[in-house]
Amino acid sequence: MKLRYISDLHLELIKSFQINEFIEQISPNQDEICILSGDIGNPYSKNYDIFMKYINESFKKTFIIAGNHEYYNNNKTIEETNEFLVNYFKQYSNISFLNNTFEYYEEYCFVGSTLWSNIKNPNYKINDMYAIKDFDYIKYNSNNQMCINFLENTVKNNNNLIVITHHVPSNDLIDSKYKVSNMILYNQWFYCDMDNFIEKNKDKIKCWFYGHTHTSSIKSINNIPFLCNPIGYQNENIHNNFTKTFIL
């Protein structure tokens, strides 16, 4: 199985006249499965429609989850946008939206969750608190627990798991440049400590895709490949590409 993995395209920042040129960089392959690990774009936008139509027609199957930015500046709650996305993706025969849900494809169980972080110091805030309607750190942590409960319940009765989350599932996956004293509180918004879960279920998890951080990475934890390929903001010039694949 050949998996194309991408995250953090941030289509909401692409000009409408640039969108077709932007997505052509994907160079799709009909033999591949596409993994979209969140922060793809504003789901209420034309750019999002153009992109999803292209993806649906270009890969034999796509699995997508929401990141935090899917919920930004829509005057909608997280629950309202989740409901919208469930209905939105019904029009696409080859795309599955996973929101604390799983789906079997061939012999693998694709498991998807935004995996919100657990916030221990609410005094240090990021844009999520301002850009998402009716959202605060209490709801943030409540969503975090729902995601963890889902993953723990799913793994009990399923094997051959391909896990897709937006938030980073281990502090070990945070780039060293962010592990400095003035970034420690900031990092709590980027990762969810799933180390015990990973260790306990290392024989069931085949690979794990994530996003949120704009640092590309392939790293093994407990012999599980953890993969991240963010495109990032255009002004970051991080030079990641659309064509990274993982063969399982």
Give the ranges of each region predicted by the language model.
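Beta-strand-turn-beta hairpins that frame and shape the catalytic cleft
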Residues: 1-4, 102-112, 159-160, 220-225
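N-terminal active-site segment of His-dependent metallophosphoesterases
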Residues: 1-64, 70-77
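Active-site environment of divalent metal-dependent phosphoester hydrolases
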Residues: 10-17, 41-46, 69-76, 102-104, ...
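Active-site-proximal loop/helix segment associated with metal-binding centers of metalloenzymes
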Residues: 111-185
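A basic- and aromatic-enriched beta-loop-alpha substructure that forms the phosphate/nucleotide-
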Residues: 61-132
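Binuclear metal-dependent phosphoesterase catalytic core
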Residues: 104, 181, 186-187, 192-204, ...
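Active-site neighborhood of phospho(di)ester-bond hydrolases with catalytic His/Asp-centered motifs
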Residues: 5-7, 34-39, 63-68, 96-100, ...
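Short amphipathic alpha-helices and their capping/turn segments at secondary-structure boundaries
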Residues: 21-26, 51-56, 94-107, 111, ...
